[in-house]
């Protein structure tokens, strides 16, 4: 009795692209494309194959071509995605665990004897990374976010309706105005949920921001949750929109010292991405908090922080 990992490595994907390039002479950056494909699929064979086929059909072997393929793939009604989502109906405990992992950032220790964790691994939703349960890949991760958020949309939640009314306010000359998005979100969140208890905010804040953001970028932009920073205290949302990239850190306020440390970490993270500007969305339960937008510079990086 043994398990066989069928996923492709970065080198394995690169080898496939090397052969393709030899035959088709596209001029692609093979190493870069292999890395991007792996980042989104973690080497899941079907996802690698499907994305490559979609890119091949368009002849756009670039990062933008890949992002377009990812966006289209996530709107497909294929047998793999149908099967995955069907498992959520069949196993309510599995659905609840995945919600806690995705929206609440709940750390889950990998335990092969836990039946729910075992199901999540077997169906391909998650994997074991250094003893922690993490999403198996960005594609499945975003598929789940989209599924859960779409259920909220069908429920006609007020934040979703606010986003639909606002969605045409945020694109200027082809550029996404992320600061303006945060300003409007803070206003709506305070009006709709300002009197809710702390437990509600802590569990629901990030979910409501994604619910507000998704209709704004839908059809044009991509988003994913950065696996390296997913935790109870912090979640980084990465948005790609018409060639521009945005990093939005959502976090729970834990005091000034924690907040300053978080800003330094975000500045370092922006350096990794080659970005000058980053965004923070802080859910603060202090009754004397100052709601709104402020701008600071940390380690040469411009940080725009929204506080609700």
Protein language model regions, located:
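Active-site metal-binding core of divalent-cation-utilizing nuclease and nuclease-like domains
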Residues: 215-243
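Winged-helix-like regulatory helical subdomains adjacent to P-loop NTPase cores
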Residues: 2, 9-123, 129, 159-163, ...
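Minor-groove-contacting beta-hairpin "wing" of winged helix-turn-helix DNA-binding domains
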Residues: 132-137
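Intrinsically disordered, low-complexity terminal regions enriched in charged/polar residues
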Residues: 296-308
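Conserved catalytic cores of phosphodiester-cleaving nucleases, focusing on short active-site segments
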Residues: 209, 237-254, 269
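Acidic-basic catalytic patches of nuclease active cores, encompassing PD-(D/E)XK
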Residues: 181-224
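Short, amphipathic alpha-helical interaction segments positioned at domain boundaries
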Residues: 140-174
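Nucleic-acid nuclease catalytic cores
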Residues: 259-263, 270-298
């Amino acid at each position: 009795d043994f398990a066989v990992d069928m996923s492709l490595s970065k080198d394995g994907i690169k080898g496939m692209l090397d052969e393709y390039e030899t035959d088709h002479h596209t001029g692609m950056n093979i190493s870069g494309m292999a890395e991007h494909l792996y980042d989104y699929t973690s080497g899941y064979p079907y996802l690698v194959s499907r994305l490559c086929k979609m890119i091949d059909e368009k002849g756009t072997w670039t990062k933008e071509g890949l992002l377009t393929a990812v966006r289209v793939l996530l709107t497909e009604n294929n047998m793999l995605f149908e099967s995955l989502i069907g498992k959520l109906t069949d196993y309510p405990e599995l659905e609840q665990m995945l919600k806690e992992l995705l929206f609440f950032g709940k750390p889950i220790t990998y335990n092969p004897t836990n039946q729910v964790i075992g199901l999540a691994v077997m169906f391909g939703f998650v994997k074991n990374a250094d003893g922690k349960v993490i999403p198996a890949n960005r594609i499945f991760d975003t598929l789940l976010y989209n599924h859960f958020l779409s259920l909220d949309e069908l429920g006609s939640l007020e934040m979703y309706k606010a986003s639909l009314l606002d969605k045409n306010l945020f694109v200027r000359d082809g550029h996404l105005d992320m600061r303006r998005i945060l300003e409007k979100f803070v206003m709506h969140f305070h009006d709709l949920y300002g009197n809710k208890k702390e437990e509600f905010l802590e569990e629901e804040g990030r979910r409501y921001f994604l619910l507000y953001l998704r209709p704004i970028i839908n059809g044009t932009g991509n988003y994913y949750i950065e696996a390296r920073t997913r935790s109870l205290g912090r979640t980084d949302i990465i948005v790609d929109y018409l060639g521009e990239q945005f990093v939005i850190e959502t976090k729970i306020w834990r005091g000034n010292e924690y907040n300053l440390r978080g800003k330094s970490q975000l500045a370092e993270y922006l350096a990794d991405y080659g970005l000058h500007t980053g965004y923070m969305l802080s859910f603060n339960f202090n009754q004397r908090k100052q709601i709104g937008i402020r701008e600071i510079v940390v380690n040469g990086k411009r940080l725009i922080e929204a506080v609700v």
